[in-house]
Regions:
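Domain-length accessory/inserted modules outside core catalytic folds
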Residues: 1-31, 38-129
Length: 129
């Protein structure tokens, strides 16, 4: 992983600036650990959720993150966009690290969504990415 971006990401996760959320890179509650990486890289690329046209439609409140051409795709609300993955020097849009007593490989989003704190995730990133 790009060492400069990694350092900024880890520092941001430990900063207390970000509220932790689950289920999306960013939503009305805050950020997933992967969303923090997007925000560290370029905080101006977030695209606010569009309210549903039909009141029966579910408004999940997920923000999209624009690509390099200021386009956005709905499939980039839960994992890193491809261009952020490449820029960061990661091999996957949802990187895996050894986690738990048995050291089983788990995705960062899964670790985030299952209750690990940003500080704990920062330690994992620092050690394994």
């Amino acid at each position: 992983m790009d060492s400069s971006l990694k350092q900024k990401w880890v520092r941001a996760l430990r900063s207390g600036k970000y509220e932790q959320a689950t289920g999306a890179l960013r939503n009305e509650d805050g950020f997933c650990c992967l969303g923090v990486l997007c925000d560290v890289y370029d905080p101006d690329k977030w695209v606010e959720p569009i309210p549903p046209l039909d009141e029966d439609e579910d408004d999940d409140g997920k923000w999209n993150y624009a690509d390099q051409g200021d386009n956005y795709l709905y499939d980039t609300t839960d994992v890193l966009p491809v261009h952020i993955t490449r820029i960061a020097g990661l091999t996957a849009q949802n990187p895996e690290v050894p986690y738990g007593i048995d050291g089983e490989m788990k995705s960062l989003a899964s670790i985030n969504d299952n209750g690990a704190t940003f500080a704990e995730i920062a330690d994992l990133i620092e050690t394994h990415l």
